[in-house]
Amino acid sequence: VEEVMVTKEMISDKTPDLIGQSVPRLDAREKVTGAAHFADDLQFGPGLLYARIKRSPHPHANIKSIDTSKAKALPGVKAVVTGEDFPGFIGLYLSDRHIFCRDRVRYVGDPLAGVAAVSEEIAEQAVELIEVEYELLEPVLDPEYGLRSDAPLVHPNLGEYEVVPFILPRPGTNISNHFKIRKGDADSAWEKCAAIVERRYRVPQVQHVPIEPHVAVAQVDGTGKVTLWGSSQSPFAQRNLIAKTLGISQSDMRVIAPYVGGGFGSKAGVSMEALAVAIAMKVKGRPVKLRLTREEEFFTVFVRQGLVGYFKMGCDEGGRLLAMENKFYWDGGAYTEYGVNMTRAAGYSSSGPYEVPNVKTDSYCVYTNHPVTGPMRGFGMPEMHAGLEQCIDDLAEAISIDPAEFRKINCLKTGSILVTGSQMHPTGLPQCVEEVAQAIEWGSKDPPSEPTKRRGKGIALMWKAPAMPPNAGSSAWVELNEDATLTLGVGGQEIGQGTFTVMAQMAAAALGVPYDWVRVAAPVDTQYSPYEWQTVASRLTWSMGNAVVNAALDARGQVLDLVAEAWDENPEDLDIVGGEVISYKSEESLSLKDIVVYGLPKPNDRGWIGGPIVGRGNFMPTYVTGLDPETGQGERAVVHYTTGAQAVEVEVDMETGKVEV
């Protein structure tokens, strides 16, 4: 990524390059020995209470009454809460849900009430004693049906919800966001096409199924300050959203996020965490633990959005793509959360990694009475590409051009004009196509190993655009200890991807110290850790990494300025290598441990200069611009695109269905 490349050039070429080298993971020993703490491992003593949730058995219904009297009377029950206790709305982009339902349930599993008790068993018994009277409503179970004028409205009050400027809901419908792309003139381009294909594809909702279920523990002290421990990809977003909904200041809301046992997007934003906090507010002083069952994981927290996609594309006789028209109907579920933004991501990526002069795309996020949707690996790209790449194969066949060659003709090159009107940054996509085709000997055919089997080869391209807001920022700090070891503060989360190790490598390389001198301050704690937007969108190495490098360079600059003053030299003549400051002019050297906390003496015993070295850094992509809501055109829609090509050879047993890659 060009931004990381720029900062890397700022690192001294005399410093051993730790980037690209295999190093031991910082969290490896903890995890293989069982010493690492995940949310469910945390101990809170005998005062811990356990929470369970009363959930709707219906996909769509009005709530006529909730009777909690029997639950409250059960011995061992310490609190029962309902939506009447918490009237505020919550949502990342569109605030369309209450913490607990107040007047209507919108999916099977919608939370109605919460119980805190001295054991999980008693809490479960209390939940069963809560009596709810419903007025059943017709559910919306398909996004296409949800678009019909006679479909029931999942959110009749859509026009009253708070929404960010770049999300465009349509009150009076089930459309929570409509994103458009209008590049060129697709309507008039079809008559110029030598071949046209049209296809419809459907992708269902999918559960993430991380090994670790969702766990949250909340405690409210006597002053009203809230602490939340949880398996979270978004501790700062949780602090912001929950505090806002509950009407407390962010300084009174603290989120501590230990290691996460798999997230894949399901632990981003706010799902079940607000439930634990709401219940804890009714039993101040005592921690309340909510741990979801595997059954709850499947229908009460985020799932991947479903998609009904219509694709139409055409090319000229030489195989050059001329036009593309897409209609995406995303199954956003009962509440939008990330779904509305995924609609945008798919919209401004709707041509796939191909240059098409004429594109018309309408991407809709549609309310249904299905589970709430959120981010899952790829953020709308796998669903969209599943249909688009099959269409590319079909169009190549229709024009009698090899599928790999067809892709090489049309794939994005450096400088290509994208569907938003911006230019493609440097990309090696054409070379990727050639390399994967060569790797599987594309064009050759090998016979199957047995008569009942069939063998085939396939190729596909991909691209992905992060759909984060243009002002999603990162920050970091670097503190040098007395022995010159380094404590690195970051707000991004370690969810198994190796982030802490990568950040340590970048900090060590930028500062000029050995990798094993670096320790990352963990767990992430919003009270002490520097701000990080979220651990999503494959963004940490790029965004948080830039903040880390800037913090390390800031510390490095302080050290060199200090030594330059003491030695009466220019900082440009100094370097830090292997934990020592060296002068290329006088050939003097000095260990960092001798200066980074206590400084250096002035000549002739006239006092000291320097002091504790703490570097600060931040990063925000200031160059992302808005898009025209009617055309989707703009100067730069996203921070960067990731591109790639894949090829595979498979053998399928036609009798058993077994697939070998």
What is the meaning of each model-derived region?
Residues 1-33, 40, 49, 165, ...:
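Cofactor-centric catalytic regions
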Residues 355-373, 521-528, 532:
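A glycine-rich, basic-preceded beta-loop-alpha segment at the flavin cofactor/substrate interface
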Residues 76-79, 252, 318, 517:
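Glycine-centered tight turns that cap/initiate beta-strands
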Residues 216, 221-226, 231-256:
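A conserved hydrophobic secondary-structure block that centers on an alpha-helix together
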Residues 356, 372-384, 537:
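A short glycine-threonine-serine/GTX helix/turn-capping micro-motif
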Residues 1-171, 196-199:
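Flexible, low-hydrophobicity surface segments
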